[in-house]
């Protein structure tokens, strides 16, 4: 994680929650290959929507489509060797072992993009400021476009592309452990030609382009240490032909440098660190609304390709973001960032919403659906606390982000006079209690292929049950303290922290809800009432 923001402490050692040893549990059975997104929505999500209408909408129809690989078993990556002399590609993430790189901690990215809409080509420069966590004779970064040139601390460096996005760097001089250094990467390419698997985070059409996705998207447009365990500051400049808008994260510093007749440069700055996938870039013809909502500057953007009545509806939804944030603040504490926003492109996205930091990306079909728009916005805005301010240490920690964002839909409804969150838990349990396939997907190890499946229901059910066991005072204090302590932390830390807020032994509860591949018994000890 970055140390540039004074709120970000040094990485904490993971706390082992010894009361819940995985070895004592039956092995998780592998599930079948995850079906295609559309088929999955029709076969699984639509029945759940009926439940959501009766209970409290979960917004499952708008979950993110991910890479579909066989499930994997959680493994602990080997500790980094402080005496090592070469950074390695991949951080040993159990689901995405090649994601990220070892040997350094990024402090800040300064990204400069030149976009040519005629050739649909990016020409870019990423300046990476980092601190070496070990002595480095060489290291890697992630970029799927063509690397044109690299310098390290001002001196030319050798580079070799390896695999899909690993770029090997050999600096002219070794980098000493604990020293700061700067890497400047020049690159170019057509993002539309970069593909991994059957989907890609790049969307183009109708004179607009957007790059946004989870768990991977940065490699399509900037050089990065592409893993959520290494958040960093973002400074993004995008040069486009005059008449186009270019949208990204953080605060809009300027939209035209004024020194070019035919081009505008849009400059965005994020003042709090973020994971690489939480950054995005959108280019096209957008209508913008700017202002201040209770002290928070906002920029909302909606594609001008959408009909006027749809733009009006989309803006009306986006303008509720401030009030939704204030509701979430009553549960999770102060909003963790200095800007708010949202963007609605014309493209048919493969997700309904994505928690890009300070400015979520919303699919037009999703935000124009009046039944789902409220829970969609609440879910993505809740991610500003859970998923953005506090990121996963590894991707198998996804419960700590998607679970809370989904529970926030229940909690916000309760806070604003809607159905009680406990009623939502009981109704969901009644519908799902006999669905063995659903319960086989555990929260401790959902498997890569099912990373974003059961968590949208089992996650909020677990949290509401935990609330019932801990009591409101302890549950909300614990959740606020967790959300207000920025950093990258594992699920094991979350369980250990929860235990520290109550005298109730949570070991049996976590065995039932986090570890077990079977339905939790309907008991008071498991949080039912």
Regions found by a protein language model. Give the residues of each.
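Zinc-dependent metallopeptidase catalytic helix centered on the HExxH motif
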Residues: 359-424
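Short, hydrophobic/aromatic-enriched beta-strand segments in well-ordered soluble domains
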Residues: 126-130, 143, 179-193, 234-242, ...
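Amphipathic alpha-helical substructures
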Residues: 308-310, 420-421, 452-526
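N-terminal, polar/Ser/Thr-rich
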Residues: 3-13, 17-123, 203-208, 529
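A surface-exposed beta-strand-loop module
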Residues: 67, 138, 144-203, 259-262
């Amino acid at each position: 994680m970055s140390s540039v923001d004074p709120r970000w402490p040094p990485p904490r050692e993971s706390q082992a929650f010894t009361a819940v040893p995985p070895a004592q549990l039956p092995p998780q059975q592998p599930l079948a290959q995850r079906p295609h997104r559309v088929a999955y929505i029709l076969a699984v999500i639509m029945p759940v929507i009926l439940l959501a209408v009766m209970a409290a909408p979960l917004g499952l129809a708008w979950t993110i489509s991910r890479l579909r690989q066989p499930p994997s078993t959680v493994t602990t990556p080997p500790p980094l060797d402080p005496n090592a002399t070469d950074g390695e590609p991949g951080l040993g993430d159990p689901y995405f072992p090649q994601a990220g790189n070892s040997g350094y901690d990024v402090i800040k990215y300064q990204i400069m993009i030149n976009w040519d809409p005629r050739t649909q080509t990016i020409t870019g420069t990423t300046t990476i400021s980092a601190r070496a966590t070990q002595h480095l004779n060489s290291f890697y970064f992630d970029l799927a476009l063509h690397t044109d040139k690299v310098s390290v601390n001002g001196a030319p460096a050798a580079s070799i592309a390896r695999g899909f996005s690993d770029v090997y760097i050999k600096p002219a001089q070794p980098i000493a452990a604990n020293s700061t250094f700067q890497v400047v990467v020049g690159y170019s390419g057509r993002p539309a030609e970069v593909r991994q698997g059957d989907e890609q985070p790049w969307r183009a059409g109708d004179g607009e382009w957007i790059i946004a996705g989870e768990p991977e998207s940065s490699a399509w447009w900037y050089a990065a240490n592409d893993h959520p365990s290494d958040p960093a500051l973002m400074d993004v400049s995008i040069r486009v032909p005059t008449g186009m808008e270019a949208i990204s994260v953080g605060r809009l510093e300027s939209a035209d440098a004024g020194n070019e007749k035919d081009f505008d440069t849009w400059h965005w700055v994020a003042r709090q660190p973020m994971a690489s996938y939480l950054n995005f870039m959108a280019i096209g013809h957008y209508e913008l609304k700017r202002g201040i909502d209770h002290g928070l500057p906002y920029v909302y953007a909606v594609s001008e390709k959408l009909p006027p009545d749809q733009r009006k509806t989309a803006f009306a939804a986006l303008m509720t973001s401030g009030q939704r944030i204030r509701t979430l603040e009553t549960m999770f504490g102060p909003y963790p960032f200095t800007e708010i926003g949202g963007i609605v492109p014309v493209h048919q996205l493969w997700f309904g919403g994505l928690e890009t930091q300070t400015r979520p990306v919303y699919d037009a079909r999703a935000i124009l659906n009046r039944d789902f728009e409220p829970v969609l916005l609440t879910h993505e805005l809740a991610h500003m606390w859970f998923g953005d301010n506090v990121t996963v240490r590894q991707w198998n920690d996804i419960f700590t982000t998607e679970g809370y964002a989904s529970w926030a839909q229940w909690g916000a409804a309760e806070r604003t006079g809607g159905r009680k969150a406990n009623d939502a838990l009981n109704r969901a349990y009644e519908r799902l209690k006999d669905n063995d396939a659903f319960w086989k997907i555990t929260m401790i190890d959902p498997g890569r292929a099912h990373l974003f499946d059961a968590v949208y229901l089992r996650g909020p059910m677990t949290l509401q049950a935990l609330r019932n066991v801990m009591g409101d005072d302890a549950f909300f204090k614990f959740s606020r303290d967790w959300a207000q302590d920025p950093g990258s932390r594992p699920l094991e830390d979350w369980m250990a922290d929860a235990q520290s807020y109550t005298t109730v032994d949570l070991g049996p509860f976590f065995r039932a809800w986090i570890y077990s591949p079977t339905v939790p018994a309907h008991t008071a000890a498991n949080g039912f009432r």
